[in-house]
Structure formats: structure tokens, C-alpha cells
Amino acid sequence: MAAEAPSGGEAPVCDSGRSDAICNFVICNDSPLRGQPIIFNPDFFVEKLRHEKPEVFTELVVSNITRLIDLPGTELAQLMGEVDLKLPGGAGPAAGFFRSLMSLKRKEKGVVFGSPLTEEGIAQIYQLIEYLHKNLRVEGLFRVPGNSVRQQLLRDALNNGTDIDLDSGEFHSNDVATLLKMFLGELPEPLLTHKHFHVHLKIADLMQFDDKGNKTNIPDKERQIEALQLLFLILPPANRNLLKLLLDLLYQTAKKQDKNKMSAHNLALMFAPHVLWPKNVTANDLQENIIKLNTGMAFMIKHSQKLFKAPAYIRECARLYYLGSRTQMSKDDLDLTTSCHNMSFQLARCQRQNRVDPSSQQEETQQHTEEALRELFQHVHNWPDSAKKKQLLRQFHKQSLTQTPGREPSTPRVQKRARSRSFSGLIKRKVLGSQMTSEKKNSSPAPESVAMGELKKASKENMNLFFSGSPAGTVTPTRLKWSEAKREGRKGFF
């Protein structure tokens, strides 16, 4: 008989008559939480969208990748899998056909090595990874080769699906480490796949910008991490799972480099050819890209603990897709909204000072307005080159050529202007318009709330997105490109 739940949110113990049968449950009486799903995995809706709506998910992720990285039409089509990838030193389609044929034959025989990556194969290889986690202090791990005879015995056991007791002492850590590299090297394609190859080269070129908007030689780590997070989201599930296991192993190995003498850079030299390099290419084929690939592999090892988390805006987008809301912002708009909110406090402070000293009202207002516009213009100007950046810059220049942020402020003038939907127009109309209103009415609302309200309205007019159509989503790449013209006429998904 089921036990009744006591009041007060206690955790009762239910005894079904057996001494070993105990069930505990907690009743939550917090009314705001009733009817709300409790999600412990922050990427729950991301994974749900990936499995249930793969096309919608891929277009969402790829659109944000193109926001960070400039991908020409051919490279974008390669990333989407729409065209075949042209690689340096490739042996042509015939070699690919025979390689696929041999992989199918191996798969039929249940062979792990040389077969396409599967969850069953990962389960076998996980025995090696688990054993190496216990032996990270061995000097020269992954660099010193093991015994070839023992490696062949271990290889045959894995191919046959035999249970292996690696802790018996029959095999050495170097045998296991070398066999793991052999498994990765014999995959039909690199772990990070051929179609992602050019994107990884572009990620290595992401650099910071100086105050004047010029590109520097300092890597932009935040953008690189964000780009890798997005790129890993569209990896095949088996590749993503094994990559996570591998990078975590290499990260833990590098943490003990004082014992094993294997830094992240040394490990990158060992694994980049198996994880990043296209198959059937040599160092001469890659030429100047070798440094980029090795550096990129070392970067992934160092930051592996951050790379398998979906960006916050992707999580929010997936959550809203399933919870019924149709409004969502992109990463650029989230940054821009934050900038606008910061400026709203400056404008509010400016208005308070103007009401205290009416004699200098117009001059100080114009000065603070120009400063706010210059700050917003500089924030947008520092974005990486993209279509959205060009559209926003055109809005600034179209608003007023004589008052473009970054120039010397012109003579302050207070006059009625045509209604503008741009950020600069909204800021100037709010500041100057509110002054004229405050002179006529003494009971005007607080400047902080007014400034925040107008700037939030600006964000909604320029940045709100909507999932159009049914939840299945009629999301097309053009909607994912944030067309300004479409947003003014009608609202689209992205």
C-alpha cells in the first residue's frame, strides 16, 4: 500500500515489507515551480533539437558559424555536405571508392580497426582510454612506442570483441597508448571529418582587433572557443563522443607533464595527423597549414573542458523552440543589447544633470549623446566582418553624415526630425525629445525608466526574431542570415 505524503515538503520513507526496499521522494510545495520541467542537463533542449529536427538544428548552428568565420560559397557548401571536399594531395574518387569498399568488408567481419566509427567500436576502444587514465604518469606516454608483438595480441582481442584484462600486467602503458593512436590513424576519415577541415584552418586565423578596428596577431581565444563549440555540435554523434573522451584524456595527460614530460604541444604533434589531417596527405601537401593544425590541436587540448558545452544563445534558442516562445536573439544582438543598456545609464545620468543645470542643458546633452554614439559605433566596428556589421554601419552613416560617431561633434541643434528606426536616431530622439517634454510637463517619468524603455524598444525593433510557421520550423538559410529588409517588412526566424 502506498504511503501518503506528509505536508510541509518532507521526504517520507516508503517500506513495502522488505528490508531492502526503500523509496525516497520529495514533494515540492513551491507554487512557482509547479508545472515547470526540472532540467538538470543545460544542453537538454539542444540535444533534443539535434535529434528530432536535425535540419533546423544544423541551419541554426551553421548560421552562427558563418557569423564568426567568413566562409565562401564553396567552403560553406562543403561544411553542409552539399559538395565533395577537394583536399591537397587527394588520390581521386576511385581511391575513396575502394577505401569505402574495404571498410564495408571489415565492418561485416566485426573488425574495429580500419572500420567506420561506431558506438560499438568506441565501447571497445574505451577499455584503452580507461586504462590510460590510470597510468598518466608514465614518462613519454604516447611518444615512446610499445612492443609490436603485444600490440598485435591486443589488437586481435579488440577486433574479436574479447574481454581484456589490461590490469593483469601482460601489457605495458606504451603498448596501449600506441594502439590507441593506431586506431585513430586507421579510421576511414579523420576524427574531425574531412568536411570540417577548412573551417579549422579559419578558426586558427581568428585574431583580436585593436582599438582602431585593425586585426592584430593576438589569437582571439573567446571567438575560437565559441567557433569550436558550434562546430563540435554538428559532428556525427560517434565522432563527437570519441573526441570528448580523447581530448579529456589528453587534457589530463598534459596536466601531469611534470611526470610524463608530455605537454599539450607535444601531444598535439602526436595526435594532429590522426585527428585533423586529411587522409592520404603528407606534410609536403599541407605545407604552411601544418603549424595552424598543430596549434589548433594544442588549443583544443588546453580548452577541452569548455568545448563540449553549447553556447548560451544556442541553449536559449533550443529551449524557446520547445517551450512555445517565438522570440529569440542572436549572439550579436545579445552583445548589442548589453551595450545599449550600459549607454542607457549614461543617458539617464546626463538627463539628471541637465535638469539640475538648465542653462547648459543643450550643450551637455549633445556632448553625452555624441559620446554614446561613438561608443556604440566603436562596439559595432570591432565586430568581425559580416553582413550584419555592414548593415548596422550603413544605418549609422545614413542617419547623419555630419554626426557620424568618431567625428568632432557639430553645433548642437534641437529640431524635429523624421522618425528613424536606427539606434542613433532613437538615442538622439529620446534625449532631445525628452528635454522638450520635461519643459512642458513637470510630472515626467524617471529618466532611467524612459531611457531603458526606449532602448529596449530599439532592441525589439532591430533584433527580435521569430520562429515562423509550425514548430517543425520552415527555417531556411536565408532566414538564418538576418536580412534587415525582411525584419522591417515582416518578422523571420533568424
From Swiss-Prot:
GO biological process, one term: signal transduction
One protein family per Pfam: RhoGAP
Feature type site, description Arginine finger: 143
GO MF annotations, alphabetized: GTPase activator activity
Stretches for region Disordered: 399-451
Cellular component annotations (GO), alphabetically ordered: intracellular membrane-bounded organelle; plasma membrane
Key words of the record: Acetylation, GTPase activation, Phosphoprotein
Positions of modified residues (N-acetylalanine): 2
Phosphothreonine, modified sites: 478
SMART domains: RhoGAP (SM00324)
Listed SUPFAM superfamilies: GTPase activation domain, GAP
Positions carrying Phosphoserine: 7, 31, 422, 438, 470
InterPro entries listed in its UniProt record: ARHGAP19_RhoGAP, Rho_GTPase_activation_prot, RhoGAP_dom
Keyword Acetylation: yes
All copies of domain Rho-GAP, residue ranges: 102-308
Cited function: GTPase activator for the Rho-type GTPases by converting them to an inactive GDP-bound state.
PANTHER family hit by this protein: RHO GTPASE ACTIVATING PROTEIN 18,19-RELATED, RHO GTPASE-ACTIVATING PROTEIN 19
Protein name (database record): Rho GTPase-activating protein 19
Originating gene: Arhgap19
